Amino acid sequence: MEDVVVKQGFLYLQQQQTFGKKWRRFGAALYGGSGCALARLELQEGSEKSRRGEAPRRVIRLNDCLRVSEASGEASSPRDTSTFFLETTERLYLLAAPTAERGDWIQAICLLAFPGRRKELSGLEGKGGRPRMEENELYSSTTAGTPQKEFAVTVRPTEVSERCRLRGSYTLRVGESALELWGGPESGTQLYEWPYRFLRRFGRDKVTFSFEAGRRCVSGEGNFEFETRQGNEIFLALEEAISAQKNAAPPGPQTQPVPVPAVLPRPESPYARPHDSLPPPSPTVPVPTPRQQRGLEGEYAVPFDAVARSLGKSLRGVLAVPPQLPADPLYDSIEDHPPPRPDHIYDEPEGMAALALYDSPQEPRGEAWRRQATADRDSSGLKHGYIVGQDFAASGWPQGTEYDNVVLKKGPK
């Protein structure tokens, strides 16, 4: 497959010799990239020798190009020519082209060396103006330690590279958010990209750069290996891009914490509630505990006897013993009755009465047989006797009493 020639003509190259600098004329041919070759600028000395293939050939790879700019300050250029700089990672070239063709050469070289600026340069070409080339500060050689962004690599056969049908040389570009692989039959065609967040790991040595892609990548998961002597530069550029992406990531929206209620709300009951029932208290509003309403305090001090009376009532309720019914006695009490209490002529003042914890006991009234016996006496006052063994029957005497041998005597009072 023949390489596509983008532009062809002649250029002057300034070379350093023993006794100073000298311009030499070369036949120049600008080739675009393909699946088997990279974009390059080839310089051959002498037109007749180049036809026979005997002339030495100098190749400048455009994937190593850092900047292309005009060099208007160079006054020692050949007649009817204008100079421009072509800087690569290896050296700085000072070239001279016919004044009318210098802009075309610069634009053609930039289109192949910097595919990302193809739209910008095409717009300038459509307007008919010459592109104004300025020094690229990002790739400037004056900035020490600045890693490159595009690198020429050759794919090593692996399982995943065979599945993706990748063979030969390509351009590996370190983008802002993904690692990109450019190449193919048409120059400037992006084949694959691997976002940084989907790369599991990456590494390098003196002649190899490799990385492991995750299963969320377009190519699928697997290890990719590339032959290159710029493995360390690719590694540094990739580290810098990942760090920049982390720092530039916008912070996510701050979520306000949702307050969790102390008590979950009660679900609405599917059944009707009686109209006279009170609604349940709100779980969030504390229900005040009802307190016992105190009586209205008087404007004056409470008398001490009233305090004693209330205290006595409270003690009476605590110490009171439930009243027990008196049992029927076998013998009636014949003792004298307790003297009656004196009747008071005047009522006692309120609050001065003695506190009575217990009521006065009442005498039992089981005296029916005594009253009956008193009614059976005769007027003479004689005593009746009861003879043992003799059936005694008297009118009015209760029959079947428990004690039959009791003799009543009337004693002196």
Swiss-Prot record:
Domain IRS-type PTB per the UniProt entry, residue ranges: 147-252
Signal peptide: none
Annotated positions of the Phosphotyrosine modification: Y271, Y300, Y346
CDD domains recorded: PTB_DOK1_DOK2_DOK3 (cd01203)
GO BP: cell surface receptor protein tyrosine kinase signaling pathway; Ras protein signal transduction
Keywords assigned by UniProt, alphabetized: Phosphoprotein
KW Phosphoprotein (keyword) present: yes
PROSITE patterns: IRS_PTB, PH_DOMAIN
GO cellular component, one term: cytoplasm
Post-translational modification: On immunoreceptor stimulation, phosphorylated on C-terminal tyrosine residues. Phosphorylation on Tyr-346 is required for binding to the SH2 domain of NCK. Phosphorylation on both Tyr-271 and Tyr-300 is required for interaction with RASGAP. Phosphorylated on tyrosine residues by TEK/TIE2.
Span list, region Disordered: 247-292, 362-383
Alphabetized SMART domains for the sequence: IRS, PH, PTBI
Origin: domain of life: Eukaryota
Claim: Metal-binding is one of the keywords in the record: no
Biased composition (Basic and acidic residues): 362-381
An MF annotation (GO) of this entry: transmembrane receptor protein tyrosine kinase adaptor activity
Chain intervals with Pro residues compositional bias: 250-268, 277-289
Span of domain PH: 4-114
Pfam family, one: IRS
Subunit structure: Interacts with phosphorylated RASGAP and EGFR. Interacts with RET and NCK. Interacts (via PH domain) with TEK/TIE2 (tyrosine phosphorylated).
Domain description: PTB domain mediates receptor interaction.
Entry's family note: Belongs to the DOK family. Type A subfamily.
Role according to the record: DOK proteins are enzymatically inert adaptor or scaffolding proteins. They provide a docking platform for the assembly of multimolecular signaling complexes. DOK2 may modulate the cellular proliferation induced by IL-4, as well as IL-2 and IL-3. May be involved in modulating Bcr-Abl signaling. Attenuates EGF-stimulated MAP kinase activation.
Protein known as: Docking protein 2
Source organism per UniProt: Bos taurus (Bovine)
